Amino acid sequence: MSSISERIKFLLAREGLKQRDLAEALSTSPQTVNNWIKRDALSREAAQQISEKFGYSLDWLLNGEGSPKKDLESNIPPESEWGTVDAWDKNTPLPDDEVEVPFLKDIEFACGDGRVHDEDHNGFKLRFSKATLRRVGANSDGSGVLCFPASGDSMEPVIPDGATVAVDTGNKRVIDGELYAINQGDLKRIKQLYRKPGGKILIRSINRDYDDEEADEADVEIIGFVFWYSVLRYRR
């Protein structure tokens, strides 16, 4: 996130806030928050307010340096799990500490029980270390893990169009603000979910140009928890 605008959008998405919510929390106007994003500018005083209110690093807010927040640093795997980047193809032997999981052509081919539709003929795979899968609570043998490309801009800037996501179909417990692959009336999407009283689910897009939706829990099938995503950024 090289711009102040991107970092503010990330903060809004991470905290589950709209621009007016952030403005209210900081005792300023929604137009001021909109100007921060539109003009890609943030005063040090405003950044200090955000830092004190929400715990974000001042250096990160103003300059994009370091980790956004201390609690996000705790999610970084230990060095023993970093490994190295190696070139490989389908003929490369699978190391003992890695597993292959299906890479589907589209989320439409994902099933909530981890199966893959026969129509998905590409046969592509992605490799994960067993340690990584154990760390996120997924099966270390890769069963129940599916990958596919995200489509559309509703989850930007966190998950842009074309990003690769990984879903653990064995983890369907809804935790407010986390990301899930869902199936609603045969429409499969990635969304941020919140539980509400009366057996309701709030379905939120990170891109605040999209309105929140509300649905009955019974009408929303949780395909699985989005535990990983990878973004390729092209040079402008």
From Swiss-Prot:
One Pfam family from the record: Peptidase_S24
Keywords linked to the UniProt accession: DNA-binding, Early protein, Repressor, Transcription, Transcription regulation
DNA-binding region: 19-38
Residue stretches making up the HTH cro/C1-type domain: 8-61
GO annotation (BP), single: negative regulation of DNA-templated transcription
Family matches, as InterPro entries: Cro/C1-type_HTH, Lambda_DNA-bd_dom_sf, LexA-like, LexA/Signal_pep-like_sf, Peptidase_S24_S26A/B/C, Phage_CI_N
CDD domains given in the database record: HTH_XRE, S24_LexA-like
Keyword Transcription regulation: yes
GO function terms (MF aspect): DNA binding
Name of the protein described by the UniProt record: Repressor protein CI
Species per Swiss-Prot/TrEMBL record: Enterobacteria phage phi80
